[in-house]
Amino acid sequence: MLFVPRYMPLLLGFSMAIAACGPAAAAVIATRSYSYFTIKGKTADQLDQQLSSNGPTASGSSARHPGATKIRFGGDATYVQAGGRCRVSSAKVTVHTQIILPRWSNRKGASKQLSMIWDALSSDIKRHEERHAEIARNQARIMERQILALPPQSTCERMQELVTDVSTRGIDEHDRLQARFDRIEAVNFQNRMIRLLNNRMKTSGGER
């Protein structure tokens, strides 16, 4: 079974600035990029070996994987102090995801069966990693809403502490959601691949 874990260096730092009075504003900034690593092979075993030797590593492990998603959080918040109280004026959470996928360089001349298996596997790897990126974006939006909903505090220093606490708890929840997704995906991998292959066989006329 192939596992497709994500690699996630997480960094979230909020800067503090005192702003003029105005309505609270939010702006999640999400960017996504793709990069590829090359594999070669004419058999399923060769491709599997190439994925194991050329794939990206996960954080804290030397093991290589068929795909990965690097995720980096960041952000800042500004505050308004008026009437002896400090509130959040604006918050911006940023999340950058880099999806790393395999690219089969010498596919030409490979058997139709191997090509079909690879198409099913590579599409599943891509879907899996893009879902990791989606989870990160969704969590960034949740964190932003939670920061903007914080009640006014007596000082902006205290408000900064609350913002930091929200961001820390948000990152922890993000990690739990990502780990849960990986566990579910691993359990369902075999059935998912069988379904993908059957669908591709039907599409290509493999069933009579």
Residue ranges and their predicted role:
Residues 127, 131, 135-148, 152, ...:
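Sec-exported extracytoplasmic/periplasmic mature domains
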Residues 29-108, 153-208:
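Metalloprotease/metallohydrolase-associated module, dominated by Zn2+-dependent proteases
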Residues 1-11:
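Bacterial N-terminal signal peptides that target proteins for export
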Residues 86, 90, 96-143:
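Mid-length scaffold segments of soluble, non-membrane domains
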Residues 21-26:
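Sec/Tat signal peptide C-region and signal peptidase I cleavage site
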Residues 9-19:
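Bacterial N-terminal signal peptides
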